[in-house]
Design a protein with these regions (language model features):
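Hydrophobic faces of well-ordered beta-strands that scaffold small-molecule active sites
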Residues: 31-33, 54, 176, 210
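PLP-dependent aminotransferase-like
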Residues: 1-35, 39
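Short catalytic/ligand-binding loop motif for oxyanion handling, primarily in non-cytosolic enzymes
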Residues: 40-41, 62-66, 80, 165-166, ...
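Active-site region of PLP-dependent enzymes
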Residues: 39-44, 50-154, 158
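Conserved PLP cofactor-binding pocket of PLP-dependent enzymes
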Residues: 37, 90-99, 164-196, 202-208
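Short amphipathic alpha-helices in soluble, non-transmembrane regions
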Residues: 83, 165-173, 224-229
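PLP-dependent enzyme catalytic core of the Aspartate aminotransferase-like
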Residues: 191-232
Length: 232
C-alpha cells in the first residue's frame, strides 16, 4: 500500500478480522495497533477495544525512551498473560514464589531488566511536560517551514538533495536523521512483485529529520530554522 500519511502516528499493524474470515472461528476479531511513535493519555481507551493489542516502543529516541524493548497493552487478560509468559522463557508464575513456576510454552528471553524499566518509568513521569515542549517546538517549525506536521516523535522535512543537505547541516553542528529506504526494495521482498509505490519511493529520496527534542532552547530552534531556510 502506497501510504505514508500515517507516519508519526499509530496505525493498525494487523487486523485478525481479515484472517478469521477465512476460517470457521468463534473467537472475536481484534487488532494489533503499532504505536511505536506516539504516546498520549487515554490512548488505548480512545483508539482500541478491550481485546485489541497496542504496542509501544521504549527505544531511546521514542516518546517514552528507555534503554530498549517495548510495552504491550490490552484489557484482554488472556492475551497479556500469554505474551508475558512467552517473553519470559515460556514460564508462567503460579504464585508469589519465584522458584515455583510452570512452563506453559516454548518461549524467549525477552523480558526487560530493572534498569530498563527504571529509565522508562522516569521518562513516562515526564511525558506531559515533554509533550508540551515538543508541541511548542513543532508549532515554531510548522510556522517557519509552512508545514502541518503532527508527530511528536520526529520532525520530517523534504530536501531535494538529501545527502547534500545533511552534509550542509553537519557543517553547522546540526545533526539530522536519515530515514530508512523503501522496504519493498530489499531482496527479502523480491519473492513477490509489489504494486506501484511511487509515493513511497519519492518520499524516501527526500525525507530527512531535523533536531526535535524537549531539551532544545528557543535559541537552538531559531538557529536550526535559519540554517534550514538559508539552505533552501
Amino acid at each position: 500500500k502506497d501510504d505514508i500519511d500515517w507516519v508519526g502516528s499509530s496505525y493498525v499493524l494487523y487486523d485478525t478480522k481479515k484472517a478469521l474470515s477465512r476460517f470457521k472461528n468463534d473467537n472475536p476479531p481484534y487488532k494489533i495497533i503499532d504505536s511505536a511513535q506516539e504516546v498520549r493519555r487515554n490512548q488505548f481507551a480512545e483508539d482500541a477495544k478491550d481485546n485489541d493489542l497496542m504496542i509501544f516502543s521504549l527505544y531511546p529516541t521514542k516518546p517514552v525512551g528507555g534503554m530498549d524493548g517495548g510495552i504491550m497493552v490490552s484489557n484482554d487478560k488472556y492475551k497479556i498473560d500469554y505474551y508475558r509468559a512467552i517473553t519470559h522463557l515460556g514460564v508462567s508464575s503460579v504464585n508469589n514464589n519465584s522458584w515455583e513456576r510452570k512452563l506453559i510454552s516454548s518461549g524467549w528471553k525477552m523480558h526487560p531488566n530493572s534498569a530498563q524499566c527504571y529509565v522508562a518509568l522516569k521518562n513516562l513521569e515526564k511525558l506531559d511536560e515533554k509533550n508540551q515542549r515538543i508541541d511548542e517546538i513543532k508549532n515554531q517549525y510548522n510556522e517557519a517551514f509552512e508545514l502541518t506536521n503532527r508527530s511528536r516523535h520526529l520532525y520530517r522535512i523534504e530536501a531535494q538533495n538529501k545527502k547534500e543537505f545533511m552534509r550542509n547541516m553537519k557543517d553547522f553542528g546540526i545533526e539530522t536523521g536519515f530515514h530508512y529506504g523503501p522496504a519493498h526494495l530489499n531482496p527479502f521482498y523480491s519473492i513477490e512483485k509489489s504494486g506501484p509505490l511511487d509515493k513511497t519511493i519519492e518520499s524516501s529520496s527526500k525525507t530527512v529529520s531535523i533536531p526535535f527534542n524537549e531539551s532544545l532552547s528557543n535559541r537552538d530552534i531559531k538557529f536550526i530554522i535559519d540554517k534550514v531556510n538559508n539552505y533552501k
